[in-house]
């Protein structure tokens, strides 16, 4: 395990909402929700910390957010402006390193092992970046510092907002043992439920399981979790990363014959894919359905749409059509997956902050 790298994960605090509160004094100190009209179908893109106190969070339907926070201020937001501010933040990063891997407009990995300013301490680099962002842009950021990307990302969420958490190599396993497994990369709702049934709630619980037992119960997720809880993860920051597809799949606990269950899974996946595409500021044109039967035979079917989309309903309709054409109930399904490919950046004026 290479522990020589110095990696920072910078995550802007409530980015869109913070930009709006900075630019509009009337929003400051108030529950601000980016996501459009709560009387229409939509999802929360992000919200201010004042709104989060009421239980509002990103990807929540705006109608639900309005019930939780009836005095909330709902706005559509200005994506072109957020992109502009994101570029200003990226310029600050580039003063320290060219090895920058953006994950979205509001977060990125930085490898500062050999930074431009010759600073020996990654912690000092992270703190200086935070201070510079606040001084020049009036925004706060949280930072995680460690020797690999997985730990740095978890650490950045540890002391929000405006916090910094440093995890040295010798502290990594103890740090990860205290973390809820729901914070681990790749642990979504389905995997979290499986872990809960197995009595695995924290990294410490996870660490008690052998690699083989985790793989048996969780398949590839088990292998990843076994490595992650021991601090073994990818530590290469890739400045040329460009997401080619966005997808979601699940392996059922029991093989499935019921089309309704398969369609329900596709709808959940479509919503997750929409959320991720919006965060990446991309939309796609090709929908791919993946099915794995009980005998482990795997098929993939694809449909190219007439236009690009990041709309969950359009994605679901395409996937459901592929399912109806491909699956006639002839054998039980072990795994189902949905992916959107053929991606390109969204033009600002067409970006959907509203979802379903």
Curated annotation (Swiss-Prot):
Q: Could you give the cofactor binding note from the entry?
A: Binds 2 magnesium ions per subunit.
Molecular function (Gene Ontology), one example: DNA-directed DNA polymerase activity
Biological processes per GO annotation: DNA-templated DNA replication; error-prone translesion synthesis; SOS response
Look up the record and name the cofactor or cofactors this protein needs.
Mg(2+)
Chief localization class? cytoplasm
Keywords, A to Z, come to: Cytoplasm, DNA damage, DNA repair, DNA replication, DNA-binding, DNA-directed DNA polymerase, Magnesium, Metal-binding, Mutator protein, Nucleotidyltransferase, Transferase
Active site residues per record: 107
What EC class is this?
A: transferase
Q: Which SUPFAM superfamilies match?
A: DNA/RNA polymerases, Lesion bypass DNA polymerase (Y-family), little finger domain
**UmuC domain ranges (all copies):** 1-188
Read off the InterPro entries from this record.
DNA/RNA_pol_sf, DNA_pol_Y-fam_lit_finger_sf, DNA_pol_Y-fam_little_finger, DNA_polymerase-Y, DNApol_IV, PolY_HhH_motif, Rev_trsase/Diguanyl_cyclase, UmuC
Where is the site Substrate discrimination?
16
Can you tell me which residues bind Mg(2+)?
Answer: 11, 106
Family annotation (PROSITE patterns) = UMUC
**Among the entry's GO cellular component annotations, what is one?**
cytosol
> Which proteins does it associate with, and in what oligomeric form?
Monomer.
Family statement drawn from the similarity comment of this UniProt entry: Belongs to the DNA polymerase type-Y family.
Its function? Poorly processive, error-prone DNA polymerase involved in untargeted mutagenesis. Copies undamaged DNA at stalled replication forks, which arise in vivo from mismatched or misaligned primer ends. These misaligned primers can be extended by PolIV. Exhibits no 3'-5' exonuclease (proofreading) activity. May be involved in translesional synthesis, in conjunction with the beta clamp from PolIII.
Mind telling me what this protein is named? DNA polymerase IV
């Amino acid at each position: 395990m290479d522990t020589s790298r110095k990696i920072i994960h910078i995550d802007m605090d409530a980015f869109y909402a913070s930009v709006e509160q900075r630019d509009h004094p009337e929003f400051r100190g108030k529950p601000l929700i980016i996501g459009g009209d709560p009387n229409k179908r939509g999802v929360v893109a992000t919200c201010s910390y004042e709104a989060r106190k009421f239980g509002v969070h990103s990807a929540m339907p705006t109608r639900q957010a309005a019930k939780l926070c009836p005095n909330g201020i709902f706005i559509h937001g200005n994506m072109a402006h957020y992109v502009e501010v994101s570029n200003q933040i990226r310029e600050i990063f580039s003063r320290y390193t060219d090895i920058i891997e953006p994950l979205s407009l509001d977060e990125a990995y930085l490898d500062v092992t050999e930074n431009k300013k010759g600073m020996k301490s990654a912690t000092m680099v992270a703190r200086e970046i935070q201070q510079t962002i606040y001084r020049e842009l009036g925004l706060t950021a949280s930072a995680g510092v460690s020797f690999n990307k997985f730990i740095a990302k978890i650490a950045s969420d540890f002391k929000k907002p405006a916090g910094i958490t440093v995890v040295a190599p010798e502290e990594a396993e103890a740090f990860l043992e205290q973390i809820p497994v729901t914070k681990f990369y790749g642990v979504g709702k389905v995997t979290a439920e499986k872990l809960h049934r197995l009595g695995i709630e924290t990294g410490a619980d996870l660490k008690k399981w052998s690699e083989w037992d985790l793989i048996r119960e969780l398949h590839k997720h088990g292998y990843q979790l076994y490595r992650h809880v021991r601090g073994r993860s990818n530590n290469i920051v890739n400045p040329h990363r460009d997401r080619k597809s966005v997808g979601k799949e699940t392996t059922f606990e029991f093989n499935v014959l019921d089309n309704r269950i398969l369609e329900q899974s596709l709808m959940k996946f479509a919503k997750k894919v929409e959320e991720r595409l919006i965060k990446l500021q991309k939309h796609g044109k090709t929908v791919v359905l993946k099915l794995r039967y009980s005998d482990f035979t795997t098929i993939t079917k694809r449909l190219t749409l007439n236009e690009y989309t990041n709309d969950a309903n359009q994605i679901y309709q395409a996937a459901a059509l592929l399912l109806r054409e491909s699956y006639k109930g002839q054998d039980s399904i072990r795994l189902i997956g949905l992916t959107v490919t053929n991606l390109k950046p969204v033009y600002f004026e067409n970006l959907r902050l509203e979802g379903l």
